């Protein structure tokens, strides 16, 4: 019943409201889509029931935390969120971090009495959500044949959501064609409940059955089919309908909240063989547990449309709409008529058409009722299906926002399904052929939603929800269209041209292929450049969408990789197809700078966006030698559509070029870079720097700017001017020297201890800087404006600012573009091309010199280690490091034994990417008839040692060599390779030209393991400048410790292959590992923008700041609000919702509510499995969190099962040699120890100790804990000597790290004393046996006390980084005041510098362009302090 409580606005609400806010046509579209789309119905189902299902229902929000709008961050802060669309809310890396993050839970001695000062502080924050929170109303719903149903609804909900609620309930789910009436008045589906005057609490809404139309009858049949196959996982394996898998309830055998606490002696805790330490290649079958029993009972043998359709004219006049054909489980065959009043059996047979009702006739408004009447088997099976359906968690039934594909799938039975067949061959999506205008106008929908008002919080929620809904539909349609294009099912709009130049329009979406059409990219790398251009263009669309300048429009863009092809799908600008491009473009250039146009409106709009994106306005000469001003790259085109909107497209050069990968005569790189092998000539000249790098670079320069300005301000305040001048002469070289040191001081081998020693000094410097600025500020403001201006000028010069008297860092993206003539400004000014080039060079150097070492240094602590290549790529991108630097990163990691796991993951990622390039080349030239054989052959060459013999008959080969192999081969035969992998690579490893590679559709048969490995080696050297120094894949596996199953998983996910779920023997010498039957499917790899929920993000980050200050309850309330807002925007199922749930579960646990933590974390696990994937790294971490909360709730056996699942998935993903495996093994060992399984426990803890020694060193706290756990286990086994030795190691580490007086050291000393006593006692007994041959009775017995569950939980908390400490109220106040003091110091520095600069620049007319807002800086400061406290307490 929880689903019926606390309703929130759903996605249907969005589209309904958006429609109402725009046009009636849109409203009609959404109405039709909602009715016909299973995805929308499912989303509305849980969404409409809101936070009771997904939000923490047990915690109520305090009224003091309410306001009219969420915490607002500045434009810069908003941008910093917008640039990484795939990034989750910051909780993944901050206060929540991961299982290793040490969190200090403060138990306040005053139980519930919060600090009044804190309450006052929160009251001053402008946080109120009265606009979203209402008391709700209780409404009675009367359904025909059912009892009166009472539900609580939000007044903001739409009537449509009551429809979805009823369609999900067991007793009313079979109804689809009905209206809702109040006092005999039919309610409008898109009306908000609060707008209905007669509706009040206690009102009764009546469900009235409506007559069917053709459309409604089809919708009803589709809904019945969905109900019957609700438990069938086939759609999830096939990757359709936005369905996906979850196995949590299979692992736990039901809802964890319904489980009773288990006694330790009743737990079956034996781990499966594949989970115990030492397994080399984990099996594949456990990845999908119990898949054979997932389908559920079969209710019908066949339900399909009849061949007698459509009804002839006379029968239409009798009300017939369509005919169905059914075979029941009793083998009876029925022909069914659908008429306006419902469904009935007619007298037709397979051979005879007789549409009259059968005798006796039975008419039912619901097809389910009719089938239950004629088939007892159907009635029983349907009841069983419904019972199982309602037992499933709500999150298991909701559609995901985007399709998640499985890389392994079982053999699925292919059943008769008319609706599936109809969907496969219909040209539209679902029921869209019935909406006005036939097809959706994607561009109009995308742009209209962006134009919705955004001034108030409800308006912003409606707008963001509408954007998200339309974008999700567009991605689904674009993906389906791209697959249809590559499969040859769409006619080109220019069919007479060469196949690689063909373009397509399907469902109002424009599709183009990743080839260099008309030599457009000839000077930039040809097809290589054409292949990567869509990806860079997508980056540009993403950042301009994030900036969200009103009046500036981008195209809906999706990039799809499928079967070796890259397809770009874009919405269509109104009118662009009616005229030539030369006539359309009013801004930018269509020929890379030969002709350049500008437009005042575009300059105005792009100048606004450029402030956030750090793009420098610049001027270039056009073909008539006239200067033309631009506020973007030359390639960026501005087109005014027929709708009057200003569109920008071709945003591939939004950010400046990466000179480290361009060989340019005018660029002289530093000696350090040259020694590292730069510049490297890349395959294309479109390499650009990432936005994250530019932000980090500007932030670094800003810190230096403040430091230098502070030093000069101190000089201004000196008592004697003469001394000041002489000091200035001394200080200036010192500052420059400090700058030099600052560049070089980032040593990746710096130890944590060294880092801690530096902290107090930095704090003192910061305080001195603040004091100096404060003292100087008054002088600057009154009489020292000239001197202040000089200070700013010197600081700007020292950091290389683009402006002489203002901190300004913006980049010219065209500065190194060939063929563009720049208007050169005065030397030293922002218009100086030389200065612009130097800045871009400095940013590229910053990446290599600072960011790569910073990346490595960050992972030295192993606090949140990457688990697979996807994790690694995300981490690199967050530091602004492009994947083309992977070779350089690998070289750095290879010199560090403590980074061995990351080195292995990076090498595997490089091998997978190199293999992808080669694989795509062969797939393009493969005949469609032989795709499965070709793919299995390629996998055999990549992964196995057995004989490789592709099965293709010689006759067929010779016959096909002469022809083009049909429609598909027409694409492939002329295209050859594309993009990064465009030219095929011949057997000797050399590249051939595009034409020669495409000549043969059977090139794949010539691939051998040896030739493939040689190509991979050449690719790794050519693309990443890294020597893969192994002579075969086998030697590489052994050298780097890579498992074949891990490589198979990574490669399948990377290129979109689905293999059969079975065990593969990679070492077979007699037959190939893969056969053509092992290739189940090929799925698309889709790249798109993820719309964001800005208000939810602001609440989330504010909540994080509270948590970092120790204000857990306030943080919980803010993050709960963030989750509510996310539910409003994204619906119940989204990655960011999962991050919020994980954080809330952790906070509940820290606040002492383990049961609430378990309930919330269970939802987080299901959500992660559904939206990320069942073996995604995030899912693995969610499982480990859930196991801890399960143990805390007394579910000991479940806790072990969850840990076994997490360990299996982790080993399948990256192998056993990983710091995260050490954490899981420590948890497993401790729980097994508590259950008395000492031998098993010892195996796991020995493995954990081995890994901890390797990755943390022999003096680390992790190692001390592992030694202590081993000692405890061995003492329980009676092996006191070994226990004593291990506890001595623990004592030694504690003593050296913490000192003799520390509590942990004293505890270890006491443990040593007890072990020594037991060891002496045991020795006495042994001596007695040896001397007397029997035991004497006077020796006391050896007593081994098993640990209590409380002590085990305490130790589990310690291992997982959670430490509960008792702190007095005075200490809490002291810590908070210290945090506030540091925050204030940071704020004062910024404010003082800004004021001083403003005074120096014409009495405050200019301002410093700081790289980030104060909120972010404060959060960083709080995080820094919290981290320091963590170390101290966890020690």
Swiss-Prot record:
TPR repeat placement: 1096-1129, 1222-1255, 1257-1290
Source organism per UniProt: Drosophila persimilis (Fruit fly)
Keyword set, alphabetical order: Cytoplasm, Phosphoprotein, Repeat, TPR repeat
Protein name: Protein clueless
Gene designation per UniProt: clu
Ranges where the record places region Disordered: 1-97, 719-762, 952-998, 1407-1435
Gene3D superfamilies in the record: Hypothetical protein (hspc210), Tetratricopeptide repeat domain
A GO term for molecular function: mRNA binding
Phosphoserine, modified sites: 266
Lineage of the organism: Eukaryota, Metazoa, Ecdysozoa, Arthropoda, Hexapoda
């Amino acid at each position: 019943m929880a689903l019926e409580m606390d309703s929130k606005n759903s996605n249907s609400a969005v589209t309904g409201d958006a429609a109402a806010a725009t046009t009636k046509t849109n409203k009609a579209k959404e109405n039709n889509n909602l009715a016909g789309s299973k995805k929308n119905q499912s989303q509305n189902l849980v969404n409409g029931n809101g936070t009771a299902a997904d939000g923490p229902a047990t915690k109520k929000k305090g009224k003091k935390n309410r306001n009219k709008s969420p915490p607002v961050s500045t434009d810069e802060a908003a941008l910093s969120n917008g640039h990484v669309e795939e990034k989750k809310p910051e909780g993944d890396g901050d206060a929540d971090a991961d299982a290793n993050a040490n969190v200090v839970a403060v138990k306040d001695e005053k139980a519930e009495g919060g600090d009044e000062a804190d309450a006052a502080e929160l009251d001053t924050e402008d946080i109120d959500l009265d606009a979203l929170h209402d008391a709700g109303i209780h409404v009675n719903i009367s359904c025909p044949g059912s009892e009166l149903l009472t539900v609580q609804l939000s007044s903001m909900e739409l009537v449509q959501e009551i429809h979805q609620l009823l369609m999900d309930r067991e007793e009313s789910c079979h109804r689809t064609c009905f209206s809702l009436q109040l006092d005999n008045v039919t309610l409008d589906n898109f009306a908000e409940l609060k707008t209905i005057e007669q509706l009040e609490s206690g009102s009764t809404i009546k469900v009235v059955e409506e007559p069917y139309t053709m459309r409604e009858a089809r919708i009803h049949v589709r809904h019945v089919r969905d109900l019957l196959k609700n438990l069938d996982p086939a759609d999830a394996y096939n990757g359709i309908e936005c369905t996906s898998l979850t196995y949590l309830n299979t692992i736990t055998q039901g809802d964890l909240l319904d489980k009773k606490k288990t006694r330790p002696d009743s737990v079956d805790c034996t781990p499966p063989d594949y989970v115990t330490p030492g397994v080399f290649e984990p099996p594949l079958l456990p990845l999908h547990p119990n898949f054979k029993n997932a389908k559920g009972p079969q209710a019908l043998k066949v339900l399909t449309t009849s061949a007698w359709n459509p009804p002839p004219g006379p029968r239409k006049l009798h009300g017939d709409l369509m005919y169905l054909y059914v075979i029941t489980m009793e083998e009876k065959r029925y022909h069914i008529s659908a008429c306006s009043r419902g469904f009935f059996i007619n007298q037709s047979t397979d051979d005879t058409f007789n549409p009259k009702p059968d005798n006796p006739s039975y008419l039912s408004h619901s097809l389910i009722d009719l089938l239950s009447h004629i088939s007892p088997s159907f009635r029983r099976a349907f009841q069983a299906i419904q019972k199982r359906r309602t037992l499933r968690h709500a999150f298991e039934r909701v559609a995901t926002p985007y399709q998640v594909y499985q890389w392994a799938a079982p053999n699925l039975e292919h059943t008769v399904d008319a609706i599936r067949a109809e969907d496969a061959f219909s040209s539209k999506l679902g029921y869209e052929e019935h909406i006005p205008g036939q097809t959706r106008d994607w561009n109009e929908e995308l742009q209209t939603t962006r134009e919705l008002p955004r001034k108030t919080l409800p308006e912003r929620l409606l707008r963001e929800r509408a954007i998200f809904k339309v974008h999700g539909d567009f991605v689904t349609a674009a993906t389906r269209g791209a697959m249809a294009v590559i499969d040859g099912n769409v006619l080109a709009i220019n069919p007479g041209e060469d196949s690689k130049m063909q373009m397509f329009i399907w469902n109002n979406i424009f599709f183009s292929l990743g080839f260099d059409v008309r030599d457009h990219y000839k000077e930039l790398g040809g097809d290589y450049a054409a292949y990567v251009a869509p990806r860079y263009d997508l980056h540009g669309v993403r950042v301009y969408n994030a900036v969200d300048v009103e009046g500036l429009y981008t195209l809906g863009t999706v990039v799809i990789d499928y079967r070796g092809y890259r397809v770009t799908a874009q919405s269509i600008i109104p009118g662009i197809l009616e005229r030539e491009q030369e006539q359309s473009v009013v801004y930018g250039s269509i020929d890379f700078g030969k002709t350049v146009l500008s437009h005042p409106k575009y300059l105005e709009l792009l100048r606004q966006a450029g402030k956030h994106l750090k793009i420098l306005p610049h001027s270039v000469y056009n073909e008539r030698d006239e200067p033309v001003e631009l506020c973007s790259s030359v390639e960026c085109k501005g087109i005014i559509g027929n709708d009057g909107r200003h569109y920008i497209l071709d945003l591939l050069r939004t950010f400046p070029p990466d000179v480290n990968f361009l060989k340019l005569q005018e660029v002289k790189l530093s000696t350090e870079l040259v020694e590292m092998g730069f510049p490297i000539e890349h395959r294309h000249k479109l390499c650009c720097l990432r936005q994250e790098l530019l932000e980090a670079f500007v932030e670094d320069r800003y810190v230096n700017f403040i430091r230098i300005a502070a030093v000069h301000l101190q000089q201004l305040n000196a008592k004697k001017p003469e001394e000041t001048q002489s000091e200035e002469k001394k200080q200036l070289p010192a500052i420059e020297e400090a700058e030099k040191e600052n560049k070089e001081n980032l040593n990746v081998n710096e130890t944590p201890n060294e880092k801690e020693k530096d902290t107090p000094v930095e704090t003192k410097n910061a305080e001195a800087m603040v004091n100096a600025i404060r003292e100087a500020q008054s002088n600057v403001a009154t009489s020292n404006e000239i001197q202040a201006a000089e200070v700013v000028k010197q600081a700007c010069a020292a950091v290389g600012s683009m402006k002489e008297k203002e901190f300004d860092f913006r980049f010219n993206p065209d500065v190194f573009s060939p063929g563009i003539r720049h208007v050169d400004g005065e030397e030293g000014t922002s218009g100086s091309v030389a200065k612009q080039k130097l800045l871009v060079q400095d940013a590229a150097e910053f990446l290599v010199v600072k960011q790569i070492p910073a990346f490595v240094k960050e992972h030295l602590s192993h606090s949140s280690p990457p688990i697979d290549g996807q994790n690694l790529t995300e981490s690199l991108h967050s530091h602004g490091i492009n994947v083309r630097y992977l070779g350089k990163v690998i070289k750095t990691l290879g010199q560090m034994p403590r980074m061995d796991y990351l080195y292995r993951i990076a090498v595997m990622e490089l091998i997978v990417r190199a293999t992808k390039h080669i694989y795509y080349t062969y797939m393009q030239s493969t005949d469609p008839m032989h795709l499965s054989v070709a793919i299995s052959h390629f996998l055999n060459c990549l992964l196995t040692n057995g004989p490789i013999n592709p099965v293709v008959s010689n006759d067929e080969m010779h016959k096909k060599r002469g022809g083009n192999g049909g429609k598909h081969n027409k694409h492939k035969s002329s295209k050859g390779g594309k993009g990064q992998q465009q030219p095929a690579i011949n057997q000797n490893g050399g590249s051939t030209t595009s034409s020669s590679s495409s000549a043969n559709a059977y090139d794949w048969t010539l691939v051998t393991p040896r030739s493939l490995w040689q190509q991979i080696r050449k690719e790794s050297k050519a693309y990443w400048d890294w020597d893969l120094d192994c002579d075969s894949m086998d030697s590489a596996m052994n050298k780097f410790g890579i498992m074949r199953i891990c490589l198979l998983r990574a490669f399948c996910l990377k290129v979109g292959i689905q293999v059969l779920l079975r065990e593969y023997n990679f070492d077979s010498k007699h037959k190939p590992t893969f056969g053509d039957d092992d290739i189940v499917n090929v799925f698309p790899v889709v790249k798109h923008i993820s719309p964001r929920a800005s208000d939810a993000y602001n609440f989330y980050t504010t909540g994080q700041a509270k948590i970092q200050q120790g204000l857990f309850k306030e943080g919980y309330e803010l993050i709960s609000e963030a989750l509510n807002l996310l539910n409003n925007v994204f619906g119940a199922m989204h990655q960011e919702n999962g991050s919020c749930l994980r954080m809330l579960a952790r906070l509940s646990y820290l606040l002492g509510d383990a049961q609430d933590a378990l309930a919330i974390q269970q939802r987080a696990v299901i959500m992660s499995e559904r939206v990320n994937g069942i073996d995604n790294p995030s899912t693995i971490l969610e499982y480990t969190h859930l196991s801890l909360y399960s143990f805390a709730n007394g579910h000991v056996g479940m806790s072990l099962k969850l840990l076994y699942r997490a360990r299996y998935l982790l080993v399948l993903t990256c192998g056993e040699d990983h710091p995260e495996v050490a954490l899981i093994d420590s948890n497993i060992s401790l729980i097994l120890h508590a259950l008395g399984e000492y031998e098993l426990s010892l195996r796991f803890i020995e493995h954990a100790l081995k890994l901890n020694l390797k990755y943390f060193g022999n003096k680390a706290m992790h190692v001390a804990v592992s030694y202590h756990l081993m000692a405890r286990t061995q003492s329980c086994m009676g092996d006191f000597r070994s226990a004593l030795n291990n506890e001595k190691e623990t004592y030694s580490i504690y003593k050296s790290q913490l000192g003799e007086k520390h509590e942990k050291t004293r505890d270890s000393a006491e443990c040593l004393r007890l072990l020594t006593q037991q060891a002496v006692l045991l020795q006495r007994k042994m001596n007695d046996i040896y001397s007397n041959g029997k035991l004497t009775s006077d020796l006391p017995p050896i007593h081994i006390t098993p640990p209590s569950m409380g002590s085990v939980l305490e130790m589990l908390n310690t291992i997982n980084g959670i430490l509960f400490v008792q702190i007095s109220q005075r200490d809490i106040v002291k810590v908070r005041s210290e945090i506030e003091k540091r925050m204030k110091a940071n704020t004062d520095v910024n404010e003082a510098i800004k004021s001083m600069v403003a005074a120096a620049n014409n009495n405050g007319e200019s301002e410093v362009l700081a790289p980030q807002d104060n909120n972010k800086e404060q959060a960083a400061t709080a995080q820094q302090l919290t981290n320091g406290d963590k170390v101290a307490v966890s020690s």
